[in-house]
Amino acid sequence: ILLITALRSNLYDKFTKQIAFITFILVVLAGILGGIVVLTQLEWWVRLIHLSIAEAILACLVVIIWKIAYLSKAPLKIDEPLTKSWTIKLSLLTLVIFCVLISGSWVVGIGATAVCTTWPFCGWKTGYPYDIHMLHRYVSGFALIYLGYVALSLVTKYSSGFLIKKSVHSALGLIGLQIILGAIMVWGEFSPTLKGIHLSVATLVWIATIFVVVSTFGIFKKESN
C-alpha cells in the first residue's frame, strides 16, 4: 500500500519513492526469510539476517516519515553544507548502533543470554560463549560513548537546531536506559518480562538513531542543493 501510494501520488519526490520501493523489496525478503526461519527450525544465523532486514525496514520507514512529516514543513536549516567529516561520523554511528542490535541477537541466538550472571563484567569466565556475551556489552558501552560524543558535537555546534537537539537527546537517553535495563535484567535473573522490555527499547534506540542521522542529513542536504 505504501509503495502504491508513493508511486501514484505527486506529493512525494523521487527519493521518497525510491525508499518506498526499497521498503517493499525488504518486506518481501523478510517474508521469505520468515518462512526459512521456520523451515530451518529457527537457526540463529537465519534469524540474525531476518532481524537485519527488519531493522532496515524500520530505517526506511523513519526516512519516509521524516521526508513527509518534517522536511516538507521546512524545519530550521543549517546555513552550511554537510561536511565529509560529519558524513563519516553519522554513518559510523548508524553502523555502531546496528552492531549493538546484531550482537544482542547473536547472544540470544546461541543461547548465551544468561551465561554471564554478573554485571558489568562476566567474572573470570572466558571463552565461548562468554566472550560473545561480553562482546555485546563492550559494543553497547562503546555505542553509548560514541553517541554521547556525536550528540555533544551536534548540540554544541548547532544549538539552534531544535529537531537535532530533540533527536540526539532521545537517542542518548534511550541507549542509556537500554544499558541500565541490561544490568537490571542480569540482577533480575533474566526475567522474560525484562528481556522483552530490553528488546523493545533496543528497537527504539535504533529508530531514534536513524532519526538523528536523517534529521541532520536532511537539513544540510536541502540547504546545500
Model regions and ranges:
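Polytopic transmembrane helical bundles with strong interfacial aromatic enrichment
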Residues: I1-N225
